[in-house]
Amino acid sequence: MKFYFAPLEGVTGFTYRNAFADLFGGVDKYYAPFISPCVNDKLKGKEIRDILPENNSGKVNLVPQILANRADYFIKATKQIMDMGYTKEININIGCPSGTVVAKNKGSGFLRDTDAMDRFFEEIFNWRDSDESGLDISVKTRIGVNDAEEFPEIMEVYNQYPISELTIHPRTRKQMYRDTPDMNAFDYAFKVSRNPLCYNGDIRTVMDYENFAKKYNVDAVMIGRGLIANPQLVNEIKGQEKLTKEMLKQYHDRLYRDFEKIMKADKHLLFKMKEFWNYVSWNFEDENKCAKLVRKCQNLYKYNLAVEEIFGTMELK
């Protein structure tokens, strides 16, 4: 089984990925948060900063991800990204449920127009084949906009093209991250897909993974929030020791130092570290108390006192 780190915009940027790779690793691929190309001839510095090779550790096998519904924008951006050295794989995001993204018929909003999807894929694969670059084009998708009944028509489009890997998050856009993954929809994809599948959705514990792996013989799983919450999760799945407070503190301290170097103000660093605790507080026996201690901090002095209390007095599950 291959393990992939899912992208999460605003969270899994290069500073985060580098710290994770140094201290935990175990992941075969890291998918970068999406780049959204537009009418400009070239992607600008802010758009590509996260994937610049000099910003990413050699331990990070990074796959850039593009959010687009126009083939010309995708091709233009892909050429520039390939010139940066990313010549193995580009991932297309057709899963993002964000309202601002969906309103532009991008991400999971693209799923409402399968005819447009078909034209998009036809054009980009014709370009890829004529370019003879050997580039793998993979896709991350949801199962529909409002209802899983949309999924068979969506799969018909995917099955017409040589997608290197189809990562399925079996929720609709309407569900966002609510409810549970629709495994009936994944069952359907497992039976009919002509392309290799990767599963994404609610793998947060070793048991979650084992229950999935018993039923489905797929080559890869992509984990996002589960790995952000427990950075040792993939290693635990592989039989290594469970996450310890010492591991988590080392990780926290590394991220704090690294973010401190690039944040322009204390309030930005405080926000970033509170975001970290939004996920990792789940590991503690009293996760609500842990989260509350951090949430009420209004400055870094109080934040550091709260962190000292958490690691000094609270235990992991």
Functional labels for PLM-detected ranges:
Residues 1-317:
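Flavin-dependent oxidoreductase catalytic cores
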